[in-house]
C-alpha cells in the first residue's frame, strides 16, 4: 500500500509539473500572440495613416481641380457675355476638360517617393524582387551627401551580393556599385577589389560580363588608364586585374570574351612594351567564331592607338582587310574605321595588293570605295564619310571615283572602256595598214594565189577579226585576252556616283560632304565634281539639295561654271523652300560667271524670283550687290537692264519700283570697279542714287565719283527755308552745295545743318549788344541814303537767324515748323550715311524733338502731357548716350527744371479748377490762371523740390566751372540761391557795366526808332516795318531779365497792399518765366556713343509655338549689346495685348550674369532662357486656332529722381515677335501617353 501510494504521489507530482509547464507554455504563446497582434495593429495604423494622407491629398487635388473648373467656367461666361453684343455666331463644341495633369496613383502608392535612405537600404534585403529592383533604381538616381552614407550603401550592397540567389538582382547591384564608384565619397579601389573577387568565385555569364563592364568603367576614371606613367600601387593593381581576367579569355560565353578583350585594351599599363603582345593576342581573336568578339578586338586595337601606341602595319593589315568580307555589318564597320587609321597614319607605307606594290593610303582608299557598295546602310554611310577624310590619295584614283570607266595599265599607256580615249590618228593608222595588205595581195601573180589560199584564209580571217570594229565600237578598246594589262579593282570606279545614287538620303548627303572636302584640296578633282553636284540639285530630299548647294558654294572660287550648269542652278530658284532659295543666292555670289550672257541670265532669274517671292528682297539685293562688285561684264548689259535706246530719250522710271531698284543695285555696285559705266547712265540715275543710298544704305555704295564734275548731292537753300514769303527772289539767294563723300564732308554737312538750326550767328541772343551798336552806327551814317538801306534790308533778309529768332516772332510759326522738318531730314540722312556720326546726329534729333515740344506748348497751352513728353526725351538723352560733355548735361538739367515747373503749374490749375455751374468756355492760349485771378499758393513740397533742383544745377555749374544761363539766373535770384565764392567783385562790376550799356542802348534804340519812322513815311516800304519789328524783338530779348525783375518788383508792391503770401508771388513769377522761356543752344564738342541692343530674330517658322498655359513657357533669347556699362539695369520685357480689353500685359525678366559673354569693351552677347507664366491666355483669342503675338524686347530700368518708388523703363531694342498658340491638354494628350 505504501508503495502504491508513493507511486501515486509521484505520478500526481509529475502530472502537476506537466500541467505547470503546459500552462507556462500556453502563457508564453498568449504573450507572443498579443505582441504579434500589437505589431499588426501598429502596421495597420500606419497603413491607415498613409491611406488617410493619400486621401487628403486626393481631396485637395480634387478641390484644386474644381476651383480650376469654376474659374474656367467663369471666364467662359465672361467671354460669352462679351461676345453676345457682337452677335458672333460660331459653332460651339464642348470638349471634356483635360487640364488636370495625368497622375498614376498606383505608381505613387507603390513607389515611395519620399522614403528615407534607411528604408531604401532595408528594401535591398527584401525577399520581393520587385521591391528590390525599385530600391536599386531609386538609389542609382540619388546623390550621396556624405561619406557615412556611402560606406553604409557599399556595405549593404556587398552583404546582399553574398546572400543573393537571383542573377538579375546581382547584375543590378553590380551596376549600382559601378555607378556609385564615380562619387567622390566612395573608395573606388575597394569596389574594384570586390568586383575582382566576384569574378574569381562567380560562374554566371551575365554576372561576369556585368563585372567586367563596371571594372572597365572604374578603370577609366582612375589615373593609370590615361597614360604611360604608372605608379607602383596602380601597376600592381593592373597586374592583379590581368591575372583575374586572363582565364576569362577562354570562356565559352562570347559576351564574357568580348568584355574581357575590351578591358584588356583599355588597361595596358606600358604601351611601348606590352602593346605588341596585346596586338598579337587581339590578332588571334580576329578569327573568333562569334562576331561580337571580332568587333571587340577591332575596337580594342583602335583604343590602343588612341592611347598613344603604335600599331604594327605588317602584322595586322593583311589580317584586318580579310574582315571586310565579314557577314556581320558591325565587324565590317569597325574594320573600315581601323584601316582608315592605318591609311592616314602611314600613307606612304608600301604594301602588296594583287601582286603589285602600292601605297597604303591608295589601297585603303580602294577598300573604303568597295565598302560604298556594301549591303548595309550604316557601312555605306560611314564609308562615304571616311572617303572625304582620307588625305594624300593619288589623283588617278580620285578621278576614277567619278566615272563608270574601267582603267587599265600596260606598257605605260592608258586606255579606257566606254569613252573615246583612242585618238583618230591610231584608227587611221590601222586602216592604212589594212589597205596596204590588200594591195600586196592583189599585186601577187595568180599562180601563187591558189597555193597560198589555204594559208591565206586564216590570215584573212584574223585580219577581219582584228580589222573590223563590229564587236568594239569606234573609240573603245578590247581588253579581252590582253595579258599585259591589269584592270583596277571595280570598287574605286564610280564610288561617288554609287553614293550619290543611293536610295537612302543619309548616304547621298555623306557622299556630297566627302566630295566637297576632297575638292577643296584638289582643284582638278573639283572641276570634275561640278556636273555631279549640279545634278543633285534635282534630288527629292530638301536637305540633300541644300547640302549640294552649300558644297558647290565652298568650291565655287576654284572652279568655272559653264553656261549649261548655270541654267540648272537658276532653274532651282523657283523652289518653294525659302532656305533652299537663300542657299542658291549665296551660291551665286561665290561662283565666277564666264561671260555677259551668263550675267544677264542670272539677273533675269533673280528678278523672276523677286516677282514670285517678294519676301526674298533682302537676300536678292545682297546677291546682286556682290555680283555687281565681282563681275566685269555689267558694262555690256546696262542698256538692256535699264531699257536705254540711244535713238530715243530715256524715260525716268518710278523710284518705288522694286525691280528698278534691284537693277540699280547691280549697276551702281559695278561702277565701283568699272568707271566707264558712269558715262552710260542717264542723268536721273545720279539723283536716284541719293534717294536709294538713304533708303537702302546696306546695298548701295555711298560714293560713286570722286571727280568734282559730277555733283551727287542736292543743294541746300537755307534762305528759302527761313524766308518763304520771298519766293520770287530765290534765284538771287546764295546757295551752298554739299558733296558727301567722306567723313570730313559729312562733318561739314552737320555743321551746316546746325547753322541752319541755330542761325548763322549762334550767339544772336547773347551778343545783341555788339549787333545793336553796329546797327546804330549804320543807321546814323545812312539816314539820308535810302538805296543803301534797301540793300541792307535785302542782305538782312538773306541772313539765317535760327529757331530762336523765329520762336520770338509768333507770325512765323509755319517757317519754324519747316525749319525743324528740314533739320530732322538732314539728321536722319547723316545717321544713315556715317556710322561714326550716327550717335551725334541721333542726339541732335532727340534734342530737336524737345525743341518742337517746347515750341508747340508755348504756342498753345502747357499741360502735364508736355512735361511727361519732355521727361521721357530727357531720360533717353541722359541714359541712352555715353560720353556727353558737361555743357550738354547742364542744358539738359535746365530743360528738366522747365519741365518740372510746367508739371507744378499744371497740377495747381487742375486742383483749383472747380466744376462749372453754367456753360463756360476755356481759352485755348493757356491753361494757367492769369495774374488778375484769385491768388494761388504753392505747397511747401513743391517749393522744396524746385529749390533742390536749382541747387543741383547750381552745384553742377560750380563744380565744373560752367556758365549759368540768364533764364536760370532769374530763378536763382527769385529763390535767393547764391554762391559767395564765385560771385566776386569782378562779377558785380561787370553787372554795373552791363546796366550802363543797357541804358545807353535803350536811348540809342529810341533815336533809331524815330529815324526809321521818318524813312517809312518817305519811302512807304513794308520791308522796313518787318525789320523794325525784328529789331524790337532783339531788344526785348536783351531786356527780358530786367523785365522779369520789374514784374517781380511790381508784384512785390502789389502784394504788400493785398497782403498775399510769398508762395503766390512765386507762382506768378513762374508763370511769367515759362511764358518768356527760350530753349538754349546745344552743341556737342566730342564724339559720343549710343547704346544699342539687337535681339536676334528666331528661326523663321510658319508654325506657332504650342504650349500649355497652366505651365510656364520657356523661350530662348539671343541678343547683341554695345556701349552698355551697367549690366544690372538690363531686363527682358515681354508684352502681349488683350483682344477683349485692349490692354497691354507685360512681364519683366531678370537677365543672369552668366548670360553675358564679352566680345569687346562694353559689348556683350546675351544668351539666356526666360520662363513666362501665361495662365488663362488662351481666352485672349477669338478662335482656338488663332495665335497670339508675343513681343520680346530688352529694356533698361532707372529709378525716378522725383520719387524713388517709381521706375522708368527705356526700351533699347526693337521688339521681336514670337507667335504662340495656347492649346488644351486634349491636343497634347497623345504626346504625354
UniProtKB/Swiss-Prot annotation:
Highest taxon of the source? Answer: Eukaryota
Amino acid composition bias (Basic and acidic residues), ranges on this chain: 1014-1030
Q: Which UniProt keywords apply?
A: Cytoplasm, Nucleus, Repeat
Q: Where is the composition biased (Low complexity)?
A: 428-462, 767-792, 1046-1057
What are the BP-aspect GO terms? RNA polymerase II transcription initiation surveillance; snRNA processing
Region Disordered, annotated ranges: 426-473, 767-796, 993-1057
The HEAT repeats extend over 236-273, 275-310, 487-524, 525-561, 563-597
In its UniProt record, a GO molecular function of this protein is: protein-macromolecule adaptor activity
Q: Where are the transmembrane segments?
A: none
Its localization reads: Nucleus; Cytoplasm
> How is the quaternary structure described?
Component of the Integrator complex. The core complex associates with protein phosphatase 2A subunits, to form the Integrator-PP2A (INTAC) complex.
| Protein role | Component of the integrator complex, a multiprotein complex that terminates RNA polymerase II (Pol II) transcription in the promoter-proximal region of genes.
Q: What is this protein called?
A: Integrator complex subunit 4 homolog
Amino acid at each position: 500500500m505504501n508503495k502504491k501510494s508513493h507511486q501515486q504521489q509521484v505520478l500526481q507530482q509529475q502530472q502537476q509539473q506537466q500541467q505547470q509547464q503546459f500552462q507556462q507554455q500556453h502563457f508564453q504563446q498568449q504573450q507572443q500572440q498579443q505582441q504579434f497582434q500589437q505589431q499588426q495593429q501598429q502596421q495597420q495604423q500606419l497603413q491607415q495613416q498613409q491611406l488617410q494622407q493619400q486621401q487628403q491629398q486626393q481631396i485637395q487635388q480634387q478641390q484644386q481641380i474644381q476651383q480650376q473648373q469654376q474659374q474656367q467656367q467663369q471666364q467662359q461666361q465672361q467671354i460669352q457675355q462679351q461676345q453676345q453684343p457682337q452677335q458672333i455666331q460660331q459653332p460651339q463644341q464642348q470638349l471634356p476638360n483635360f487640364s488636370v495633369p495625368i497622375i498614376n496613383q498606383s505608381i505613387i502608392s507603390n513607389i515611395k517617393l519620399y522614403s528615407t535612405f534607411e528604408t531604401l537600404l532595408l528594401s535591398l534585403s527584401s525577399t520581393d524582387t520587385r521591391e528590390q529592383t525599385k530600391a536599386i533604381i531609386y538609389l542609382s538616381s540619388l546623390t550621396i551627401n556624405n561619406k557615412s552614407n556611402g560606406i553604409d550603401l557599399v556595405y549593404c550592397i556587398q552583404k546582399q551580393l553574398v546572400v543573393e540567389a537571383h542573377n538579375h538582382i546581382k547584375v543590378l547591384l553590380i551596376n549600382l556599385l559601378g555607378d556609385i564608384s564615380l562619387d567622390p565619397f566612395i573608395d573606388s579601389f575597394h569596389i574594384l577589389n570586390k568586383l575582382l573577387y566576384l569574378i574569381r568565385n562567380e560562374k554566371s555569364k551575365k554576372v561576369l560580363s556585368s563585372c567586367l563592364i563596371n571594372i572597365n568603367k572604374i578603370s577609366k576614371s582612375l589615373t593609370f588608364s590615361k597614360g604611360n606613367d604608372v605608379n607602383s600601387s596602380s601597376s600592381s593593381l593592373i597586374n592583379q586585374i590581368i591575372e583575374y581576367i586572363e582565364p576569362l579569355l577562354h570562356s565559352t560565353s562570347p559576351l564574357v570574351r568580348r568584355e574581357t578583350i575590351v578591358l584588356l585594351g583599355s588597361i595596358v599599363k606600358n604601351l611601348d612594351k606590352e602593346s605588341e603582345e596585346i596586338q598579337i593576342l587581339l590578332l588571334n581573336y580576329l578569327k573568333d567564331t562569334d562576331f561580337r568578339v571580332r568587333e571587340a578586338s577591332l575596337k580594342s586595337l583602335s583604343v590602343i592607338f588612341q592611347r598613344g601606341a603604335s600599331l604594327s602595319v605588317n602584322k595586322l593589315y593583311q589580317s584586318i582587310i580579310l574582315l571586310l568580307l565579314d557577314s556581320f555589318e558591325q565587324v565590317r564597320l569597325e574594320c573600315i574605321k581601323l584601316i582608315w587609321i592605318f591609311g592616314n597614319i602611314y600613307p606612304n607605307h608600301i604594301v602588296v595588293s594583287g601582286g603589285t606594290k602600292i601605297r597604303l593610303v591608295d589601297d585603303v582608299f580602294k577598300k573604303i570605295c568597295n565598302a560604298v557598295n556594301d549591303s548595309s546602310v550604316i557601312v555605306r554611310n560611314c564609308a562615304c564619310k571616311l572617303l572625304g577624310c582620307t588625305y594624300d590619295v593619288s589623283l588617278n584614283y580620285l578621278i576614277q571615283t567619278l566615272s563608270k570607266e574601267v582603267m587599265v595599265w600596260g606598257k605605260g599607256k592608258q586606255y579606257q572602256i566606254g569613252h573615246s580615249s583612242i585618238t583618230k590618228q591610231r584608227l587611221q593608222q590601222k586602216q592604212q595598214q589594212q589597205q596596204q595588205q590588200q594591195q600586196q595581195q592583189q599585186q601577187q601573180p595568180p599562180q601563187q594565189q591558189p597555193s597560198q589560199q589555204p594559208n591565206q584564209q586564216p590570215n584573212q580571217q584574223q585580219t577581219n577579226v582584228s580589222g573590223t570594229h563590229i564587236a568594239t565600237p569606234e573609240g573603245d578598246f578590247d581588253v579581252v585576252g590582253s595579258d599585259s594589262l591589269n584592270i583596277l579593282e571595280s570598287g574605286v570606279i564610280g564610288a561617288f556616283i554609287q553614293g550619290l545614287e543611293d536610295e537612302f538620303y543619309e548616304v547621298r548627303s555623306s557622299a556630297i560632304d566627302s566630295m566637297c572636302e576632297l575638292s577643296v584640296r584638289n582643284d582638278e578633282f573639283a572641276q570634275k565634281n561640278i556636273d555631279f553636284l549640279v545634278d543633285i540639285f534635282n534630288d527629292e530630299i530638301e536637305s540633300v539639295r541644300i547640302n549640294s548647294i552649300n558644297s558647290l558654294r565652298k568650291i565655287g572660287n576654284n572652279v568655272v561654271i559653264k553656261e549649261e550648269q548655270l541654267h540648272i542652278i537658276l532653274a532651282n530658284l523657283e523652289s518653294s523652300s525659302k532656305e533652299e532659295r537663300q542657299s542658291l543666292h549665296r551660291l551665286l555670289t561665290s561662283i565666277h560667271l564666264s561671260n555677259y550672257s551668263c550675267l544677264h541670265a542670272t539677273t533675269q532669274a533673280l528678278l523672276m524670283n523677286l516677282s514670285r517671292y517678294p519676301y526674298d528682297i533682302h537676300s536678292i539685293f545682297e546677291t546682286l550687290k556682290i555680283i555687281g562688285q565681282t563681275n566685269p561684264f555689267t558694262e555690256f548689259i546696262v542698256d538692256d537692264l535699264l531699257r536705254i535706246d540711244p535713238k530715243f530719250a530715256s524715260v525716268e522710271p518710278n523710284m518705288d519700283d522694286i525691280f528698278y531698284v534691284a537693277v540699280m543695285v547691280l549697276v551702281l555696285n559695278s561702277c565701283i570697279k568699272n568707271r566707264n559705266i558712269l558715262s552710260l547712265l542717264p542723268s536721273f540715275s545720279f539723283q536716284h542714287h541719293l534717294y536709294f543710298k538713304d533708303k537702302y544704305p546696306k546695298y548701295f555704295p555711298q560714293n560713286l565719283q570722286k571727280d568734282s564734275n559730277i555733283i551727287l548731292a542736292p543743294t541746300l537753300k537755307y534762305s528759302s527755308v527761313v524766308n518763304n514769303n520771298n519766293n520770287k527772289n530765290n534765284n538771287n539767294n546764295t546757295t551752298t552745295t554739299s558733296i558727301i563723300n567722306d567723313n570730313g564732308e559729312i562733318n561739314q554737312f552737320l555743321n551746316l545743318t546746325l547753322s541752319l538750326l541755330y542761325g548763322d550767328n549762334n550767339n544772336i541772343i547773347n551778343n545783341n549788344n555788339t549787333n545793336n551798336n553796329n546797327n546804330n552806327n549804320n543807321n546814323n551814317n545812312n539816314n539820308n541814303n535810302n538805296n543803301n538801306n534797301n540793300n541792307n534790308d535785302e542782305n538782312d533778309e538773306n541772313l539765317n537767324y535760327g529757331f530762336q529768332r523765329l520762336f520770338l516772332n509768333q507770325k512765323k510759326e509755319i517757317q519754324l515748323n519747316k525749319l525743324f522738318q528740314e533739320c530732322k531730314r538732314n539728321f536722319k540722312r547723316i545717321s544713315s550715311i556715317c556710322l561714326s556720326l550716327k550717335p551725334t546726329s541721333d542726339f541732335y534729333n532727340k534734342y530737336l524733338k524737345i525743341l518742337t515740344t517746347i515750341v508747340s506748348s508755348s504756342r498753345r497751352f502747357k499741360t502735364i502731357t508736355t512735361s511727361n513728353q519732355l521727361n521721357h526725351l530727357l531720360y533717353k538723352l541722359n541714359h541712352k548716350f555715353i560720353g556727353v560733355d558737361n555743357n550738354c548735361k547742364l542744358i539738359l538739367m535746365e530743360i528738366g527744371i522747365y519741365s518740372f515747373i510746367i508739371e507744378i503749374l499744371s497740377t495747381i490749375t487742375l486742383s483749383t479748377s472747380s466744376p462749372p455751374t453754367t456753360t463756360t468756355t476755356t481759352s485755348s492760349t493757356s491753361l494757367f490762371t492769369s495774374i488778375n485771378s484769385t491768388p494761388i499758393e504753392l505747397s511747401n513740397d513743391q517749393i522744396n523740390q524746385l529749390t533742390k533742383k536749382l541747387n543741383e544745377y547750381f552745384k553742377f555749374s560750380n563744380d565744373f566751372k560752367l556758365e549759368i544761363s540768364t533764364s536760370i539766373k532769374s530763378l536763382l535770384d527769385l529763390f535767393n540761391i547764391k554762391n559767395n565764392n564765385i560771385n566776386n567783385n569782378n562779377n558785380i562790376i561787370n553787372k554795373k557795366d552791363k546796366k550802363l550799356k543797357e541804358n545807353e542802348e535803350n536811348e540809342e534804340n529810341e533815336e533809331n526808332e524815330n529815324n526809321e519812322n521818318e524813312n517809312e513815311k518817305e519811302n512807304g516800304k513794308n520791308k522796313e516795318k518787318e525789320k523794325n519789328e525784328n529789331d524790337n524783338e532783339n531788344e526785348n530779348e536783351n531786356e527780358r531779365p530786367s523785365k522779369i525783375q520789374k514784374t517781380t518788383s511790381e508784384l512785390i508792391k502789389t502784394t504788400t497792399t493785398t497782403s498775399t503770401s510769398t508762395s503766390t508771388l512765386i507762382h506768378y513769377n513762374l508763370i511769367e518765366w515759362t511764358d518768356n522761356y527760350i530753349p538754349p543752344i546745344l552743341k556737342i564738342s566730342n564724339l559720343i556713343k549710343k547704346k544699342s541692343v539687337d535681339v536676334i530674330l528666331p528661326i523663321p517658322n510658319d508654325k506657332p509655338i504650342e504650349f500649355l498655359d497652366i505651365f510656364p513657357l520657356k523661350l530662348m533669347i539671343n541678343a547683341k549689346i554695345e556701349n552698355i556699362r551697367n549690366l544690372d539695369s538690363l531686363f527682358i520685357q515681354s508684352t502681349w495685348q488683350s483682344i477683349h480689353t485692349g490692354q497691354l500685359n507685360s512681364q519683366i525678366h531678370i537677365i543672369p550674369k552668366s548670360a553675358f559673354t564679352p566680345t569687346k569693351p562694353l559689348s556683350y552677347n546675351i544668351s539666356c532662357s526666360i520662363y513666362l507664366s501665361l495662365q488663362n491666355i488662351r481666352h485672349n483669342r477669338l478662335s482656338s486656332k488663332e495665335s497670339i503675338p508675343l513681343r520680346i524686347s530688352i529694356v533698361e530700368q532707372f529709378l525716378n529722381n522725383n520719387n524713388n518708388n517709381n521706375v522708368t523703363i527705356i526700351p533699347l531694342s526693337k521688339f521681336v515677335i514670337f507667335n504662340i498658340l495656347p492649346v488644351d491638354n486634349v491636343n497634347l494628350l497623345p504626346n504625354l501617353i
